Swiss-Prot record:
Lineage: Bacteria, Pseudomonadati, Pseudomonadota, Gammaproteobacteria, Enterobacterales
Keyword Phosphoprotein appears in the UniProt entry: no
Domain of life of the source: Bacteria
Name of the protein in question: ATP-dependent RNA helicase DeaD
Catalysis performed (reactions): ATP + H2O = ADP + phosphate + H(+)
Gene it is expressed from: deaD
Residue stretches of biased makeup (Basic and acidic residues): 564-581
Organism: Buchnera aphidicola subsp. Schizaphis graminum (strain Sg)
InterPro entries registered for this protein in UniProt: CsdA_RRM, DbpA/CsdA_RNA-bd_dom, DEAD/DEAH_box_helicase_dom, DEAD_box_RNA_helicases, DEAD_helicase_DeaD, Helicase_ATP-bd, Helicase_C-like, Nucleotide-bd_a/b_plait_sf
Compositional bias of kind Polar residues: 582-594
PANTHER family for the chain: ATP-DEPENDENT RNA HELICASE DEAD, DEAD-BOX ATP-DEPENDENT RNA HELICASE 47, MITOCHONDRIAL
Length: 601
C-alpha cells in the first residue's frame, strides 16, 4: 500500500478518531501524515521538515492521541509552539480530533492569561498541554506543571522558536522531562541549532522531508498590506479604488462575516454574509444573487465558501489571514476564473508576519507589499464615478421636466448657473465627499513599520545577544521594565517575552541593559497603544514588567551612570563628593554606544 493509496482507516487509528476525521471531511492523509503517523504510532522519534499548511498538526496529534491513556489524569503529551495563536490552534486541533473520545482534556498555556485561570485548569489534570516556551518554563519553575507522566514531546515550528529567541528556554524544558519519552520535532528549515537539539535530545530520529507542491496560478496578482488603524476603514478604502466585478472577503469567524457585512452596508455597499449558520435555501439564494450580478460583495468563512465557484469574482480579500498556507491558496483560487485575470489582497497584522513568511515559503513566491491608497487616488476615483453618473443623467430623456422645476426654485437673476451647480454637487456627494482635506487613515510618521523580513535562517542574527548591533538612536525609544537580576531575569527572558507577547520580531529589539531591579530596553519608535497595553500586562518569571517609555534618552543616560557610580561607592560618600565633578565629566564624554552595550552591570 503506497502513501497515495492509503486512507486514515488503514493507518490503524482509534475508530473514534476516524469518526472525528470523517465528520471533519478528512479522507486521505497528506504526504507528511502518511509518513509520520505509522512511525509515531510505533513510538519512534520523528524529525519532520514540512511547511505550515502541509497537515503536520494532524501528523503528530492523531498518533499521539491514539496512544494516550485516558484514565490517567495528568499531562502525557506536551507541545511547544512559538506563539499563542499557534498554541491555541494546535489545542483546538487536539480537541476536534478527540471529539468522540470521552475524558480527554486539552489545555493551552500562554502568556497574557491570568495564572489563576491556568492553575485551576492544571488542577483538573489535562492529558495534553500545548504552550509557549516562556509560560511553560514559568509553570515548571513554580512547580505547577508536573511532567513526570509525560510520554510524548512535540516541538512545532522549531525554527520559528529559534528565530524568536526561545531556543534556550526550549532546551531547559527538554532537560527537565523524563528521559523515557517520545519526541517529534517539526521545522520548515533545519538550521544548525535545531540540528544540534535533535542530536542531543532525540533517539535515532526518523527524518521525514516533504517538499511543498502547492502553487498559485500566475494570472492572480497577489499583494499584502501591513495593518494599522481600523481594518474596516482600510477595507472600504481598498474597495473604493479597486476595479472589480465581484469580490469575496474571507474572515475567520461567523460573527466576523456579520460585522464586516454590516460595516459595508453602512457605507453604501451591497454585501452579504455567508457562514455556517445559514440554511441551504438562503445560501443558494445568496450565491445566485452573486452569480447574476445583483450582489457584488460576499463575506465568508473558509468552511462556508467550500465548493463556491463564481466566474465573475475578480478580487479576493483575505481580511483575516489564514492559519495555514493551503487555505490561502484555496481562497485566492476563487478569482481569475474562466480566463480572467484575478487580484488577491492579504491583510497582515504585525503579529502575523510569521504566517506571511510561511505562505511565501509554501508557494515559493514573494508577495509584494502595497500601501494604503492615498487620498489623491481616492478623490480621483470618486470624481470619476460621480462624473459617470452625471453623464448618464445628461443622456436621460426627462431633463426638461427638471429644468422647469429649477425655474420655479430660482430665477436666473438670483444666482448664476455655476454657483447653483456647485451647491447641487456638494449636496449630491452624500457620505463620500469628493474633496478630502485630511487623510485620517494614513500611517502616522512616528509609527513603526515592520520592514519586509524574508532572510532565511542562515542569515539569522548571532545567538550571542550581547553582540547585537546597535540601531541608530533616532529609530528607537527607551523603555523601562520592572524586572531585573534580583528577580532571576536574564536578557534572553526579556527578548523572548517581548518577541512573543508583543509579537515583535526579535531582530527589532535593540540593546538591553540589565540592573538589579529593572532593565532598560531599546524598542522601535511608534509602538501602538494596543501593543504597549499587551506588554504592560506581560510577566517575566511571574513578575509583571509594567513597561514604561522613557522620554528623555540623553538625560536618562547621564542619570543612570551617576546612580550606578553612587551605588558602587555608597560607603564612601566623601570620596564620591570629591571626585563627583571629574566622574560626571567623564560620563558626559562617554559615547552612547558604551551605555547601550547589552550586558549586565
Amino acid at each position: 500500500m503506497t502513501h497515495t493509496e492509503s486512507t486514515f482507516s488503514f493507518l490503524g487509528l482509534n475508530p473514534f478518531i476516524i469518526k472525528s476525521l470523517s465528520k471533519m471531511g478528512y479522507v486521505k492523509p497528506s504526504p507528511i501524515q502518511a509518513a509520520c503517523i505509522p512511525l509515531l504510532l510505533e513510538g519512534r522519534d520523528v524529525l519532520g521538515m514540512a511547511q505550515t499548511g502541509s497537515g503536520k498538526t494532524a501528523a503528530f496529534s492523531l498518533p499521539l492521541l491514539h496512544n494516550l491513556n485516558i484514565n490517567l489524569k495528568a499531562p502525557q503529551i506536551l507541545v511547544l509552539a512559538p506563539t499563542r495563536e499557534l498554541a491555541v490552534q494546535v489545542a483546538e486541533a487536539f480537541s476536534d480530533f478527540s471529539k468522540y473520545i470521552m475524558g480527554i482534556h486539552v489545555l493551552p498555556l500562554y502568556g497574557g492569561q491570568r495564572y489563576e485561570v491556568q492553575l485551576r485548569a492544571l488542577r483538573q489534570g489535562p492529558q495534553i498541554v500545548v504552550g509557549t516556551p516562556g509560560r511553560l518554563l514559568d509553570h515548571l519553575k513554580r512547580g505547577t506543571l508536573n511532567l513526570s507522566n509525560l510520554y510524548a514531546l512535540v516541538l512545532d515550528e522549531a525554527d520559528e522558536m529559534l528565530r524568536m529567541g526561545f531556543i534556550e528556554d526550549v532546551e531547559t524544558i527538554m532537560s527537565q522531562i523524563p528521559k523515557e519519552h517520545q519526541t517529534a520535532l517539526f521545522s520548515a528549515t533545519m538550521p544548525e541549532a535545531i540540528r544540534r537539539i535533535s542530536k542531543r535530545f532525540m533517539k535515532n530520529p526518523q527524518e521525514i522531508k516533504i517538499q511543498s507542491n502547492i502553487t498559485t496560478r500566475p494570472d492572480i496578482k497577489q499583494s499584502y498590506w501591513m495593518v494599522y488603524g481600523r481594518k474596516t476603514d482600510a477595507l472600504i478604502r481598498f474597495l473604493e479604488v479597486e476595479d472589480f466585478s465581484a469580490t469575496i472577503i474571507f474572515v475567520k469567524t461567523k460573527n466576523a462575516t456579520l460585522e464586516v457585512s454590516e460595516a459595508l452596508e453602512r457605507n453604501g455597499y451591497n454585501s452579504a454574509a455567508l457562514n455556517g449558520d445559514m440554511n441551504q435555501a438562503l445560501r443558494e439564494q445568496t450565491l445566485e444573487r452573486l452569480k447574476s450580478g445583483r450582489l457584488d460583495i460576499l463575506i465568508a468563512t473558509d468552511v462556508a465558501a467550500r465548493g463556491l465557484d463564481v466566474d465573475r469574482i475578480s478580487f479576493v480579500i483575505n481580511y483575516d489571514i489564514p492559519m495555514d498556507s493551503e487555505s490561502y491558496v484555496h481562497r485566492i483560487g476563487r478569482t481569475g476564473r474562466a480566463g480572467r485575470a484575478g487580484r488577491a489582497l492579504l491583510f497582515v497584522e504585525n503579529r502575523e508576519r510569521r504566517l506571511l513568511r510561511n505562505i511565501e515559503r509554501t508557494i515559493n513566491q514573494t508577495i509584494p507589499e502595497v500601501q494604503l491608497p492615498k487620498i489623491e487616488v481616492l478623490c480621483k476615483r470618486r470624481l470619476e464615478r460621480f462624473a459617470k453618473k452625471v453623464q448618464e443623467q445628461l443622456e436621460s430623456r426627462d431633463l426638461d421636466e427638471y429644468s422647469a422645476l429649477l425655474d420655479k426654485l430660482y430665477s436666473p437673476d438670483d444666482l448664476d448657473i455655476k454657483t447653483l451647480a456647485s451647491a447641487l454637487l456638494k449636496m449630491a456627494q452624500g457620505g463620500r465627499p469628493l474633496i478630502i482635506k485630511k487623510d485620517l487613515l494614513q500611517r502616522p510618521s512616528r509609527e513603526f513599520s515592520f520592514k519586509d523580513d524574508r532572510r532565511r535562517e542562515d542569515n539569522h542574527r548571532n545567538n550571542n545577544r550581547n553582540r547585537r548591533e546597535r540601531r541608530e538612536l533616532k529609530d528607537i525609544d527607551l523603555y523601562r521594565i520592572e524586572a531585573g537580576r534580583n528577580d532571576g531575569v536574564e536578557v534572553r527572558h526579556i527578548v523572548g517575552a517581548i518577541a512573543n507577547e508583543g509579537n515583535i520580531n526579535s531582530r527589532n529589539i535593540g540593546n538591553i541593559k540589565l540592573f538589579s531591579s529593572y532593565a532598560i530596553v531599546e524598542l522601535p519608535k511608534g509602538l501602538s497603544k494596543d501593543l504597549l497595553q499587551r506588554l504592560i500586562k506581560t510577566k517575566i518569571l511571574n513578575k509583571k514588567i509594567n513597561i514604561k517609555l522613557l522620554r528623555d534618552i540623553k538625560n536618562y543616560e547621564t542619570r543612570t551612570h551617576n546612580r550606578s557610580i553612587f551605588n558602587k561607592d555608597k560607603n564612601n560618600k566623601r570620596r564620591f563628593s570629591d571626585n563627583r565633578l571629574n566622574k560626571s565629566s567623564s560620563i558626559k564624554n562617554e559615547t552612547k554606544s558604551s551605555f547601550f552595550r547589552r550586558k549586565s552591570v
